[in-house]
Design a protein with these regions (language model features):
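Conserved nucleotide-sugar donor-binding subdomain of glycosyltransferases
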Residues: 72-108, 115-116
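An aromatic- and histidine-rich active-site surface loop
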Residues: 43-44, 109-124
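Structural motif
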Residues: 2, 107-108, 170, 208
C-alpha cells in the first residue's frame, strides 16, 4: 500500500511518531510516498527528522500557536488574531495538500494532528481515505477523564482535536494505558509510537534530572524548584 503522511511540525512528538510509523510500514511491505510537514516562520525541521525519514519531505505553511510573554503556554488571543490574518496563505496550503494527496498515488493518508488536513477533507473532499494518529485523540474517548481545569479551555481543546480529524475513517489514540476502543467515536486506543533508539536505551545513575518541557519558560520554574 502507498501511504502519504501529513505531519504537524510544531514540537517534536508528531515528527517522532511519523519516523516510527514509517519504519513500521516499511517493515511490513508498505511504501511511504511523501511526507508533508507543516511549517511557520518559527519552525525548522530538526536534524534527527531529516536524517531518519526516508520518504521525500515537502513543506507547507500551517497555523501555529503563539506563546505568552513568559513562554509557558500558548496565548489564545494572540494565536487566533495572528492566524486569522493568514487565512489566504492557509487556503493555498489546503489546495497544495489536496493536490499532493491526489497526485502522489497514495492509497491512504495518515494525519499526525495537522489542522489543515481536517480542513482539506472538509472543503475539498479528497478521494483517498484518511486515518488520524496522536495521543490527543484520547481526549475524544468516552472514558477519558481530564484533570480539574477550566471547562472552556477543555472545550476548545476538544474542538481543535475534532477539527484536525475531520474526514478520518479512524482515530488512533496513542496511550501507555490500556483502554477499550470507543467505537461510537471511531477511536481506537493503541500503544505509543516509540523510536527503536528509545527502547534500546539503558538508564544510568547520576546526579541529574531528565525531563521534557513543552515551553522553555518552564525552565525558570525548574531551576527554582
Amino acid at each position: 500500500m502507498k501511504v502519504l503522511f501529513i505531519v504537524q511540525g510544531e514540537g517534536r512528538g508528531h515528527l517522532t511518531q511519523a519516523i516510527t510509523m514509517e519504519e513500521l510500514l516499511r517493515r511490513n511491505g508498505h511504501e511511504v510516498v511523501e511526507v508533508l510537514v507543516g511549517k511557520s516562520n518559527s519552525r525548522c525541521l530538526p536534524g534527527f527528522f531529516n536524517r531518519s525519514i526516508q520518504a521525500p519531505v515537502k513543506r507547507f505553511l500551517s497555523p501555529n500557536f503563539l506563546p505568552t510573554p513568559a513562554n509557558k503556554r500558548a496565548s489564545l488571543a494572540r494565536s487566533v488574531a495572528y492566524n486569522l490574518t493568514r487565512l489566504p496563505v492557509y487556503l493555498k496550503s489546503m489546495h497544495y495538500i489536496h493536490r499532493r494527496i491526489e497526485e502522489s498515488g497514495a492509497e491512504l493518508v495518515i494525519n499526525f494532528y495537522e489542522l489543515l488536513t481536517g480542513m482539506t477533507y472538509l472543503f475539498f473532499r479528497p478521494s483517498v481515505p484518511q486515518i488520524s494518529v496522536g495521543h490527543q485523540y484520547l481526549f475524544l474517548h468516552r472514558d477519558f477523564e481530564f484533570p480539574g481545569k477550566n471547562g472552556f479551555h477543555l472545550w476548545l481543546l476538544r474542538l481543535f482535536t475534532r477539527l484536525t480529524c475531520i474526514g478520518a475513517r479512524e482515530k488512533l489514540a496513542l496511550s501507555f494505558r490500556e483502554m477499550e476502543d470507543d467505537e461510537e467515536a471511531y477511536v481506537r486506543v493503541v500503544p505509543p509510537l516509540l523510536r527503536r533508539e528509545v527502547l534500546s536505551c539503558e538508564g544510568t545513575e547520576g546526579d541529574y534530572l531528565h525531563g521534557y518541557m513543552v515551553n522553555s519558560g518552564f525552565g525558570e520554574n525548574i531551576l527554582h524548584w
